[in-house]
Amino acid sequence: MITFKRLSSARWGALLTSIAVLFFLAITKGADAKAGADLADIQAYRRLRTTTADAYYASEDRVFSVVKALKDLAHNAKLTFSLDKQLKVNNRFEVLRVKQVKTDVFSSSEFTDWAHYVAKICKRGRLPADRAIFKTMAAHYGDDELARMLATAKRTSRDTVVYQLKEIQQKSWKESGKSADDVYAILQLDAGGQNVLNNPGLPAWLSYVKSPSTDYIEALLLKLREQYDDVTVAKMIVSSQSGVNKRISGQLEKELSTAWRKNHITEMEVFQLLKLNDAGTTLLKNPILEIWFHYVWKMKRNDPYELLVSWFKKAGIDDAGLGKMIATAKQDDRNYWIAQTLEQRLSGK
């Protein structure tokens, strides 16, 4: 009689996998195991791995877990292609040690070799192969971690695969009924505090909330305003204007200005709203002053420089003080153009 405890880790894992697959084939003979995209289906075989670490599961626990998992798979029968092929995809993932890659997984040779293998054994086109890749990676990494991996993936020759995986994940979220707030949390967009606009996962969230009835930039502004006041949102916009999401930042600034305009907020009210009136002699170096300038120009009612001069007088800043402010601001990388133009206006040039 064979004593299971005396089997080597490798033989134990192989024996369990063989028993599980044979069991599945026995109970699913003639069953239709065709396409679908349910993430839960493949989560089950995560414990079929035959690595040394897996050998330390309690023997009874492992056997019954495998059997139950395959029963569930047989019941659902929603795999992209047959389970034996899906298991081959998973096995090759482990053999190539894709999960051992610590950075830039999608640009690694391990992932490339694995993706080529999946495409080769899948005879039904690119999409089923991508679904099999998604199922396997989601089973190994978890949905949340995979979402962040896709969001931070660098541009490579495998961009098409990454794009398809993102599409599959978005569909998976919608089918499982995840809300915009759920996806916001999955992508950990608030993990960096006020650094949301620099988060590489932001485009994925915007894509998720976008619909014929939903303006995604408006949705973003509403989301940010739930947590921050307008001056903080303005600072966030400014700090992300040269980052990975600079296009989104520009759109968000326009949306913020539109919101002010719809609420009939005047130029000087926005000046106070952004707390520029508290800046004192550092006003010309304040990074969000530019946002105020853009709003004044959008309103097309006043000259922002004339409004500034009027404010300087009310604030008790004399010509000498203003001259020092201009000289200092001209050295500023962001607002030098405001200082230069103001100087020219005051000198009559």
Swiss-Prot record:
Main localization, broad class = secreted
Q: Name one GO cellular component term.
A: extracellular region
Domain of life here? Answer: Eukaryota
Localization recorded for this chain is: Secreted; Host cell membrane
GO terms of biological process kind: symbiont-mediated suppression of host apoptosis; symbiont-mediated suppression of host MAPK cascade
What does the record note about the induction of this protein? Answer: Expression is up-regulated during the biotrophic phase of infection on host plants.
Q: Where is this motif: RxLR-dEER?
A: 46-62
Q: Which UniProt keywords apply?
A: Host cell membrane, Host membrane, Membrane, Secreted, Signal
Q: Which residues form a coiled coil?
A: none
Where are its TM segments located?
none
Q: Where is the signal peptide?
A: 1-33
Give the similarity note. Answer: Belongs to the RxLR effector family.
| Domain text | The RxLR-dEER motif acts to carry the protein into the host cell cytoplasm through binding to cell surface phosphatidylinositol-3-phosphate.
Q: What does this protein do?
A: Effector that promotes P.infestans virulence in Nicotiana benthamiana and potato. Attenuates cell death triggered by the pathogen-associated molecular pattern infestin 1 (INF1), indicating that the effector suppresses pattern-triggered immunity. However, it does not attenuate cell death triggered by a range of resistance proteins, suggesting that it specifically suppresses INF1-triggered cell death (ICD). Targets host MAP3K VIK in order to utilize or promote its ability to negatively regulate immunity.
- Subunit details for this protein? Interacts directly with the potato ortholog of vascular highway 1 (VH1)-interacting kinase (VIK), encoding a predicted MEK kinase (MAP3K).
This chain's protein is named RxLR effector protein CRE15
